[in-house]
Amino acid sequence: MTKIEAIIERAKDGTYTVYCKDEIFSGAGDTLAAAKEDMRRQMDFYKETAVAEGFKYPAFLDGEYEVSYTVDMASLIAYYVGAGIFSLAGLEKMTGINQKQLWAYLNGTTPRKTQSARIESGLRHLNDDLNSIFA
């Protein structure tokens, strides 16, 4: 199975964009799910058009493939804070990063790798806790 890497970004207007790292495919939508679905539809449309017109297309489109998504920290924070799932205070408790700094990340400041790792670690810890409760 071919693995396709895609990047998720949230625009300032609240919409989402998904684009493949090494392929030509992308998608956009008002929600993250809509952007992912738009990219999948574009991949299907590309293949259908290529077949109908006799053009070459990436071989992985004929078989099974998996899309692996990566999200930038600002988009990740915006998604969960914007949806009301987390507050900045809650993220501060999970990550140890103060709310003012998290707010800066939410508004476009790119966190250093160490700060990104702290955010990821905090979210993974929450995931582990939830998995242990509901396993």
Regions found by a protein language model. Name each.
Residues 1-54:
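DNA-contacting interfaces and partner/effector-binding or oligomerization modules
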Residues 1-3, 38-100, 104-105, 109-114, ...:
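Short, charged, surface-exposed hinge/linker loops at domain edges
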Residues 114-132:
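DNA major-groove recognition helix of helix-turn-helix/homeodomain DNA-binding modules
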